A protein has these predicted regions:
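Short hydrophobic/aromatic segments of transmembrane alpha-helices and their interfaces
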Residues: 7, 80, 184, 378-379
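Outer membrane beta-barrel
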Residues: 31-57, 73-213, 220-239, 311-331
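Bacterial N-terminal signal peptides
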Residues: 9-19
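Outer-membrane beta-barrel pore domains
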Residues: 27-29, 37, 55-60, 69-73, ...
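Short glycine/proline-enriched turns and hinge-like loops at secondary-structure junctions
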Residues: 218-221, 255-256
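Bacterial N-terminal signal peptides that target proteins for export
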Residues: 1-10
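Sec/Tat signal peptide C-region and signal peptidase I cleavage site
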Residues: 20-24
Length: 442
């Protein structure tokens, strides 16, 4: 027994000796050392946000596509996570770094039509309905491969919004940016260049990727992303111009592709931030339009949207406010003098989604059936406003209202105006990394 005890002591001593020796060469978990760019340093980090919500009003036609609360009946309430992140960042040396990020999130929330109790959830869930982690980022960065430019290879953040626009909006815990709601990828598998010049006042991002986010590529068509940005007035005024392109189907007699143009302007400071983001997305040969006199045409889908937001301090480092309004038209090509109905042919996710007439189980409240209305033309008006209470740095409680209004563009049906209204107590916390501003969440 004495011999076994001695062996255990020796093993424990050996473990601590190895750990101490390793610590002398590597700092596996130091945010400050990692941010300083020190060799052989890394950090474990993560953040979480979710809500307690109550849906006081439900759109009778369950429009909104992949919106957070589409397909959830009136008077439903629940506690829910909307995102959990667990990441590790590592500096090999001053020239090379890497990142790995695992995510569990409601990318396509359970209950979104046409998902029902019989067809299964449409969210990022396992076959038995449990939320699970997936690989969201996994890449290596070669810093200053050309002076001022980094090369990034692997699953990485795209130039679309996550690197800049989302950070200025700040409140991803409340809602996605307007282009994110329409599922422009925030991450993708490919090779990219990130450039930054003039003391960080000007820059660009380019990326060639699969266009399938974390999923394996199913075609050879690539998604081409790019943006250029500039900061003025001591980096308070921010301007960003973004564009992307992807072929969707390409064969004799049918050329189907998408191309987005997006602009963003904001004034950002600690006391107050105001911004506007707008986009036009042209999706060629994407819509079947039924003629009044019979027959049909294949026409383009021309979607456009604009978002206005503001957030600022009430009590510095303790209490803030935020508000946002989005206006979205899924297709400005609607012509009631020529066509009676529209339907998507093979639209990219988030576009040309119709409403659904749904029934729910009287005993459980789960979705039972979902029947398409066949009308994807409804204009959306989104509004959110709330408060951000920070009892401690990196911990946030955010009471807010979430409102989405829908109105059809078809004269044959009338506007059929209705809305979703949700009241929420949102919580957010981050660990392992720290930001320069107390209110910063991203």
């Amino acid at each position: 027994m004495t011999r076994n005890f001695a062996k255990q002591i020796l093993l424990i001593a050996a473990f601590f000796l190895i750990a101490t020796a390793s610590e002398a060469q590597y700092q596996w978990n130091s945010d400050s050392a990692y941010r300083a760019g020190a060799e052989n340093t890394g950090r474990i980090w993560g953040y979480v946000f979710g809500d307690f919500y109550y849906k006081s009003k439900a759109d009778s036609l369950n429009r909104g596509g992949n919106n957070q609360y589409t397909g959830i009946p009136k008077n439903r309430n629940a506690f829910a996570f909307r995102r959990l992140y667990l990441g590790y960042d590592f500096n090999f040396n001053k020239s090379f770094s890497s990142e790995l990020l695992l995510a569990a999130e409601d990318n396509f929330p359970a209950g979104n039509p046409p998902s029902t109790a019989t067809t299964g959830a449409s969210g990022d869930l396992t076959s038995n309905g449990k939320e699970t982690f997936f690989i969201k980022l996994a890449n290596v960065r070669w810093k200053n491969i050309v002076k001022g430019t980094d090369l990034v290879v692997g699953e990485q953040v795209t130039p679309s919004f996550a690197a800049l626009t989302e950070k200025v909006w700040n409140y991803r815990s409340v809602e996605r940016t307007i282009s994110d709601i329409l599922r422009t990828p925030s991450y993708d598998m490919g090779a990219g260049l990130n450039g930054k010049y003039a003391k960080g006042n000007f820059g660009y991002n380019l990326l060639v990727a699969n266009g399938s986010s974390d999923k394996p590529a199913s075609t050879s068509f690539k998604w081409f992303y790019g943006d250029v940005w500039a900061m003025f007035l001591d980096k308070h005024l921010i301007v960003d111009v973004y564009a992307d392109y992807q072929r969707l189907n390409w064969q004799t007699g049918y050329h189907h592709d998408r191309q987005m143009l997006k602009g963003f302007v904001a004034y950002s400071s600690s006391p107050i931030t105001v911004g506007v983001e707008g986009f036009v997305n042209n999706i060629r040969a994407d819509t079947k339009a039924t003629k009044i006199g019979g027959g049909s045409d294949t026409i383009a889908t021309k979607a456009n949207g604009v978002a206005f937001f503001v957030h600022g301090d009430i009590v510095t480092n303790k209490l803030r406010f935020f508000a946002r309004v989005d206006l979205y038209n899924p297709n400005s090509k609607v012509d009631n003098s020529k066509y009676t109905a529209y339907s998507g042919i093979s639209s990219p996710n988030g576009y040309m989604t119709p409403g659904y007439k749904m029934t729910f189980s009287p005993s459980t409240g789960a979705a039972a059936t979902a029947t398409s209305t066949g009308d994807p033309t409804s204009k959306n008006t989104f509004f959110t406003a709330g408060l951000d209470f920070m009892p401690f740095k990196d911990i946030h409680f955010e009471p807010n209202v979430w409102y989405e209004h829908y109105a059809s563009q078809l004269t044959s049906t009338g506007k059929q105006a209705d809305a979703d209204v949700v009241w929420r107590m949102t919580f957010f916390f981050v660990f392992g990394k720290h930001y320069s501003n107390t209110y910063t969440q991203l």
